[in-house]
C-alpha cells in the first residue's frame, strides 16, 4: 500500500510462505488452516485500529437503541405504574357466551358507564384474542368538569378522534385519554361499516397498567437506522472510497447493501402482506392442507384470479376464459353500462366477473399477457395448481433491485468516475425504496404484477443497452436489451415510453457517425430492432385473435365502473386532469400516515373517472422544475461536444 515494510510485516510474510518439516526441509506449502490463520492475523494487523473504532461506535449505537426501546418506546409502562386500576366488568350490561366473554352485536355495540367520578388516564378495551382478527374503530366520549354533556366535532372544535383497536394486538387495546379533572360519564361505541359481528369482549378497565414490552423487531429497526445514519455521516469513510479507484471495496459495499435490501423486501412481502397465497405448517397455517410441505391457495376473491384463469384457458388452447358469462349479460343491449348490469344482476341473482373484458359472449383478460406466459402457464402445466401471484411480484421486485443497482453501477463506473461509494448508495437506496415497488410488494395482486414486470424489464433493458455502448461484441447486449424493453408492451404498455431513451443512446453512433450503413453496424441495428418486431407481431396476433384488431388490447371492453366504449376524449375533463397529475400540491396531516389523498374538484358537468392521487408530479418532485431550462443545458452540452442527441433527449424529457 505504498508504505515501507517493517520487521513484523516481513516476519508475517515468511511465516505465511515457509514451513519446517520434521526432516529439516523447508516447505512452501502451508495448510489451509494456516493460510486462514495467517490471513486473519494480517487483516487484524492492518485494520485493528479501524475495527476497534467501528466496534466502539456500534456498541454505542446499540446502547442508544436499547435506551430508546426501554425508556422511550415503553414510556407508558413507567407512567402507568402508579395508576389505581378500576375494573368495569360488573357494570357491563351485555350478553355473555359460554366462555364468559361479552358479546357485542350489530344491535347492541355500545357501552355506557355513569357516575364514575374518578380520574381517568387510560382505558383498556380487552377484546378477546381468540376470534377473527380485525381492526375495530371505537368512538369514545366522556363528560368532565369542562363538559357536562358529551362533546363532538363542531365548526370550531375537534372532538375525540376514533381509536383503532385490533382484536389481536395487545398494545392497541390501551387508549390514553386527555381529561381535565374527574370523569363523570363514559361512553364507548363500536363504529364503522366494515365490522364483523359478534365481537368478543373480555372486559373494560380504567387506569390500566401498561406491561413492559421489549419489541425485538423495533429494536433491530432502530439499531439499523442509527447504523445507517452513522455510516452516511459527513465524515464517513465511505465517501473516500471511489467507485473506480477502489473496485473491490466499492463492490463489496454495494453487494452488502443490496443483500440487505433483498432480505428486507422479501421479509416485507411475507410478513407485511396478507395477500401471499402460500401456506406451510408455520406460515398461513390456516390455509395449509396438512400434508404438503408448501401449498398454494386463492387470495383476493374471484376477481383476482384472472391470470390463473387465463393460464387454464391457454392450457386448453383457447384465449377466452372458461367461465361462461350469465345469459342476462349476453342478452343486454349495452353490457358495459354499470347501472344496467347492477339492475340485471339484482333481478336474476346471477353473478358476473368484474374488471374483465367482455366481447362476443366471452370473458377475456385485457391485462398484459407476458406474466401469464412467464409464470402462470408454466406453473399450471407443471403442477396443475394456480401460480401464487405474490411470488411473481417478489421475484420481479428482486430483479428490479438488482437491475437498478447494476444500471447505476454502470453509470458510476463509466460516466461519473469520481463518484464515491457513499454518494452511490445515497442514490441507490432511495431509488429502491422510494420508487413505488414497496407498495407493489405490500399489495401483491395481479394488478401489481404487470407493473412490477414492466419495471424490472425496463431497468434490465436499459442496463443491457448501456453495456452495448462499450462492448466489443454489441449484438448480444443490444438484442437482450431490446427484448427486455419490448416485453414491457406485454406487461404495462405505458412504460414503453422508456424505450424512447434509445434515441439519445444510439442516435450519434448509428445516425450521426453513419455506423448504420456499415455491414457490422447494420447487423447491430438489426439486433436492436428485431426483438421489437417479434414481440409486436406476437402481441398484434394475440389482439387480432381475441378482438379482430391488431391494435385493440381490449381495455375498452372492460366490465368496470363506467362504459369505456363511450368514454372518448373531452376537453372539459382535460384541465382538472392536468392539474391533478402535474400541479396538485400534496395533502399532508400531522399524524400517521401523514400523506393523505389529494382532493379533486371539477366544474365538468358530466361523469369524471378518477383514482386516488397524492399530488402532482411537479409539486412532489421539485427537481423537475429544471425541465424549462433543459434547452439551455443541452445547448451548453452541444457547444462542448457536438452531437445530434439533442432531439432525442428533448423527446425523452
Regions found by a protein language model. Name each.
Residues 467-486, 520, 527:
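Short hydrophobic alpha-helices at membrane interfaces in multi-pass membrane enzymes
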Residues 300, 304, 316-367, 432, ...:
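Interfacial juxtamembrane loops and adjacent helix segments
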Amino acid at each position: 500500500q505504498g508504505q515501507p515494510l517493517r520487521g513484523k510485516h516481513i516476519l508475517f510474510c515468511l511465516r505465511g510462505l515457509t514451513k519446517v518439516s520434521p526432516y529439516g526441509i523447508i516447505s512452501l506449502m502451508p495448510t489451509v488452516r494456516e493460510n486462514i490463520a495467517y490471513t486473519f492475523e494480517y487483516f487484524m494487523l492492518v485494520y485493528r485500529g479501524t475495527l476497534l473504532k467501528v466496534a466502539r461506535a456500534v456498541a454505542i449505537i446499540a446502547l442508544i437503541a436499547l435506551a430508546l426501546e426501554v425508556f422511550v418506546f415503553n414510556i407508558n409502562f413507567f407512567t402507568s405504574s402508579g395508576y389505581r386500576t378500576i375494573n368495569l366488568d360488573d357494570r357491563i350490561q351485555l350478553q355473555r357466551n359460554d366462555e364468559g366473554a361479552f358479546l357485542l352485536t350489530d344491535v347492541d355495540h355500545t357501552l355506557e358507564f355513569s357516575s364514575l367520578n374518578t380520574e381517568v388516564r387510560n382505558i383498556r378495551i380487552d377484546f378477546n384474542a381468540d376470534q377473527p382478527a380485525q381492526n375495530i374503530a371505537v368512538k369514545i366520549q366522556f363528560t368532565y368538569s369542562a363538559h357536562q354533556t358529551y362533546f363532538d366535532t363542531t365548526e370550531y372544535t375537534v372532538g375525540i378522534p376514533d381509536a383503532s383497536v385490533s382484536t389481536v394486538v395487545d398494545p392497541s387495546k390501551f387508549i390514553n385519554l386527555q381529561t381535565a379533572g374527574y370523569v363523570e360519564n363514559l361512553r364507548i361505541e363500536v363504529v364503522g361499516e366494515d365490522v364483523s359481528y359478534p365481537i368478543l369482549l373480555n372486559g373494560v378497565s380504567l387506569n390500566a397498567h401498561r406491561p413492559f414490552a421489549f419489541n425485538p423487531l423495533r429494536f433491530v429497526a432502530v439499531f439499523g437506522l442509527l447504523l445507517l445514519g452513522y455510516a452516511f455521516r459527513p465524515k464517513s469513510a465511505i465517501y473516500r472510497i471511489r467507485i473506480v479507484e477502489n473496485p473491490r471495496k466499492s463492490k463489496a459495499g454495494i453487494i452488502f447493501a443490496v443483500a440487505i435490501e433483498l432480505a428486507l423486501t422479501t421479509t416485507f412481502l411475507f410478513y407485511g402482506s396478507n395477500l401471499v397465497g402460500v401456506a406451510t405448517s408455520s406460515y398461513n397455517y390456516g390455509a395449509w392442507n396438512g400434508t404438503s410441505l408448501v401449498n398454494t391457495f386463492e387470495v383476493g376473491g374471484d376477481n383476482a384470479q384472472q391470470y390463473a384463469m387465463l393460464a387454464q384457458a391457454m392450457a386448453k388452447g383457447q384465449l377466452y376464459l372458461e367461465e361462461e358469462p350469465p345469459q342476462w349479460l349476453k342478452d343486454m343491449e349495452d353490457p358495459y353500462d354499470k347501472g344496467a348490469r347492477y339492475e340485471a344482476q339484482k333481478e336474476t341473482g346471477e353473478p358476473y366477473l368484474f374488471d374483465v373484458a367482455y366481447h362476443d359472449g366471452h370473458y377475456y383478460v385485457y391485462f398484459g399477457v407476458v406474466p401469464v406466459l412467464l409464470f402462470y402457464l408454466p406453473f399450471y402445466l407443471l403442477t396443475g395448481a394456480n401460480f401464487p401471484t405474490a411470488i411473481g411480484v417478489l421475484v420481479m421486485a428482486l430483479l428490479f433491485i438488482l437491475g437498478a443497482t447494476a444500471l447505476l453501477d454502470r453509470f458510476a463506473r463509466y460516466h461519473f468516475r469520481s463518484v464515491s461509494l457513499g454518494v452511490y448508495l445515497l442514490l441507490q437506496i432511495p431509488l429502491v425504496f422510494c420508487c413505488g415497488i414497496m407498495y407493489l410488494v405490500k399489495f401483491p395482486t395481479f394488478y401489481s404484477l404487470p407493473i412490477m414486470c414492466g419495471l424490472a424489464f425496463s431497468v434490465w433493458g436499459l442496463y443491457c443497452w448501456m453495456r452495448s455502448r462499450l462492448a466489443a461484441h454489441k449484438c448480444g447486449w443490444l438484442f437482450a436489451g431490446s427484448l427486455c424493453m419490448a416485453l414491457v408492451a406485454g406487461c404495462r404498455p405505458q412504460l414503453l415510453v422508456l424505450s424512447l431513451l434509445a434515441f439519445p443512446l444510439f442516435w450519434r453512433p448509428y445516425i450521426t457517425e453513419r455506423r448504420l450503413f456499415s455491414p457490422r453496424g447494420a447487423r447491430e441495428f438489426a439486433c436492436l430492432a428485431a426483438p421489437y418486431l417479434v414481440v409486436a407481431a406476437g402481441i398484434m396476433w394475440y389482439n387480432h385473435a381475441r378482438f379482430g384488431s391488431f391494435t385493440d388490447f381490449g381495455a375498452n371492453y372492460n366490465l368496470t365502473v363506467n362504459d369505456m366504449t363511450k368514454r372518448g376524449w373531452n376537453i372539459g375533463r382535460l384541465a382538472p386532469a392536468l392539474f391533478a397529475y402535474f400541479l396538485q400540491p400534496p395533502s399532508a396531516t400531522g399524524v400517521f400516515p401523514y400523506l393523505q389523498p389529494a382532493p379533486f374538484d371539477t366544474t365538468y358537468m358530466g361523469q369524471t373517472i378518477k383514482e386516488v392521487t397524492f399530488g402532482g408530479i411537479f409539486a412532489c418532485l421539485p427537481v423537475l422544475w429544471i425541465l424549462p431550462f433543459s434547452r439551455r443545458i443541452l445547448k451548453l452540452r452541444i457547444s462542448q461536444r457536438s452531437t445530434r442527441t439533442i432531439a432525442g433527449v428533448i423527446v425523452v424529457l
